[in-house]
């Protein structure tokens, strides 16, 4: 009894209101900043302050799906979006030829400026955030009287222990990292930087199921480069920023803008790769998977032998005339001398120099089905994971996880209730739900196509979806962000109201140049926004009361009006699909052993993942519809519900059983 009480006063008091974030990458920075903004005393532990803001791979943020994450991070008060806007040397909105639901902002960075701006931003968090240099080697965990495991402290290389009730691990590719250049293997998490080997062993010893993934980065090039042999791509004249605060302002880029250039590999390139595959063991490690949507050059050549060429984007890494170039699409792990031959076989790069060779990197990760929706581990209270340690790839995915893990660590340290973000609220919620219910077999990359709610979780409306939440929990660091949001929302609400009140007959609309059916039906301007044959800005320009509304607000109004019908249809479809599953909670202490006629494989999945809702249960790969019915019976039962369940799920179950029988017969 005395030891328990003594332990409480010696450790629990010191750990209270204390968050330690391990790793100063994109996930770590967002986690530390989020916890700090909430008011929790936070320590950001990094091997070197000079490496905060380091962009390990490509010099760009955003892209398809990723741009939406960047807007969501900003809507939650994150730091990276604003830093990107101030460090960008090209802004480009992707997917303009498609619908607004998949428009994706992207921006090219000046590496050195981004790094400087990020370090400057973190330095402003002086009230609650301390940046400390050091390397964590282990985590001390206490087992309380009820058997629950809780975080106690982290231990540094020099033996120093830092008390912490909440720990966020964001180690990126450093966890058990090994880089490969040809047959040369080095223990490293990034070129020239030591990996975190003891921490990986510690997590394994704590009982976490671990896996191993791989990725790679292309060589860095320097002049002379012959851009006359390439196709130039300029940025947008009017930049679409990541930060909503900058969208509201008359934003002008802080830096001069630069172009990117397009070139291609050749048959000679592919022949060089094929002849030297034996010297790329990184590629040959088939049991360790690399990103499907960012394949290495070796993977592209072997997977698509019929293709005569592959696209290469040459991206500037900065404004300095001596800045390096990043050949996006040339990731590989060939020996350096082979890389020189590859580069010389590509139009425009025949005479350039390799200043840093391409390399592959293998690293450990924690199987993410061991996490809650808050990114807290199920095994240890107060331990959170974010970024590549969860099996994802990409700056944006890491930063988004970082802000979620950091805010929940901060809330926990302050004794407040946790926050999770559901699938229907944000693309961040889709990513986290995919990770914790499905797990990963290859590095996970966000796409809008992964979301069944992509019409409502767009890049343009991330503030409407998430900023009120951020304000309610104290995640916005000052009132500027909130006041900007309120102004925008007020203008949107006003514009929406006026558009719905502006009602004319077909003849009146025709006189204004709007060819609509002459059916005698009066229609509002809002109704006309769903017409595909009209210039929607011309429709809005017909409304006198909206003449002074900023174009950016009118653009958002048009998007909402354009998608109204489709959003309603999406809602109906998802309601039918989900069958109220997201709100049907499975008790956290439910004993899955009480379920009958459940396979051993399913039982193992249920015990490992412990789904929180029926919605999560349905998304677990390997769970049969019949098992869903049985679990719903145990969750709550009434005869009417039983009949409904059989009507909805049994056709699926019968089809599933039929397919199984067919495969058995084969």
Curated annotation (Swiss-Prot):
Transmembrane segments: none annotated. It is found in: Mitochondrion. Residues 1-16 form a transit peptide. One of its GO terms (molecular function) is flavin adenine dinucleotide binding. One of its GO terms (cellular component) is mitochondrion. Its main location: mitochondrion. Its cofactor is FAD. It comes from the Eukaryota. SUPFAM superfamilies: FAD/NAD(P)-binding domain (SSF51905). FAD binds at residues 23-28. Keywords: FAD, Flavoprotein, Mitochondrion, Transit peptide, tRNA processing. Pfam families: GIDA, GIDA_C_1st, SAM_GIDA_C. GO terms for biological process: mitochondrial translation; mitochondrial tRNA wobble uridine modification; tRNA methylation. InterPro entries: FAD/NAD-bd_sf, GIDA_C_N, MnmG, MnmG-rel, MnmG-rel_CS, MnmG_C, MnmG_C_subdom, MnmG_C_subdom_sf. The keyword Lyase does not apply. Component of the MSS1-MTO1 complex that catalyzes the 5-carboxymethylaminomethyluridine (cmnm(5)U) modification at the 34th wobble position (U34) of mitochondrial tRNAs. NCBIfam families: mnmG_gidA (TIGR00136). Belongs to the MnmG family. PANTHER family: GLUCOSE INHIBITED DIVISION PROTEIN A, PROTEIN MTO1 HOMOLOG, MITOCHONDRIAL. This is Protein MTO1 homolog, mitochondrial. It comes from Schizosaccharomyces pombe (strain 972 / ATCC 24843) (Fission yeast). The gene is mto1.
